[in-house]
Each structure stands twice: as structure tokens, then as C-alpha cells.
Amino acid sequence: MFRIPILALTVLLCIASLSCQPYSTGLQQSVARADETAATAALRTIAVAQRTYSASNGGDFGTFQQLCEGGYLDSRFNSSKPALKDYVLTMEVAPKSEAQAEGFYSCNADPVRTGPQAGRHFYIDSTSSELHVNPGESATAKDPIAQP
């Protein structure tokens, strides 16, 4: 007599526990996508700041610290490797030379987290305003362009 309700309860508990996993994974991916949005917005802000800095500084590009000192970026970026949300930003800057009329910069946004809650890796540089994306490792100019 009690076997049927206990069996039904066991089946319901199994179904409930199985449905929690996809829900939790979905929440983790939602957080990663929100962090990606913040990272890509930061890279686009950096690109605008670099173009403005370059126009004011004879074709040279600036480091994070130089961009902050000049008022092109806010204090969140005033570090050699600023961290925004769950991303770390890194930038390389090369000055102009006799062989190169303009300087060069590249900037990466790499997630701090790993596993299913990690976001994608992004890249932008002075040759294009396009964001490049790589799902598993630091992105480069050779990676595909990020689609909105």
C-alpha cells in the first residue's frame, strides 16, 4: 500500500534533481555572457580612447596608465593589467618608427574563470575596429570576428 506513493516520490525526486543541472549550467553561462558584454564594451572604449590619444600625440598610442593620465579612460583602467568583472585586460603598445608611420597597439580581454562559467577571449588592435574572439585561448588578429 505504501509502495506506490514511495515509488512515485522517488521518481519525482529523480526528475527534480536531473532538471536542476541544466538550470544551474544556464545560470552560469548567463553570468559569463554578462561579463563578456562588459569586456567587449571595455575594448570598444579602449579603441576610441586610443584613436583619440593617437590623434593628439602624433600617431603614437598610449598604455593604460597614459590613457588614464590624459583623461581618455577612467580610473578603473589605471593599471598595467586592469580587471573588469571577471576579465583581465592586457595591452601591448609599439611606438611609431621610420619604417612605420603610426604606432601600434593590441588589447586582449581574457576571462579569469575556467570551465563552463568562463567566457570567451577577445582581441582588438589599431589596424581594425573589429573584435576577434576565441572560445578557448587568448584571441589574436587571426581569430574570427565576434558576431553580435
List the predicted regions and their residue ranges:
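A short acidic/small-residue loop/turn micro-motif
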Residues: T25, S138-A141
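Compositionally biased regions
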Residues: L18-C20, S80, A139
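Positively charged n-region of N-terminal signal peptides that target proteins for export
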Residues: M1-I4
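Amphipathic alpha-helical segments typified by the pilin-like N-terminal helix
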Residues: L18-S54
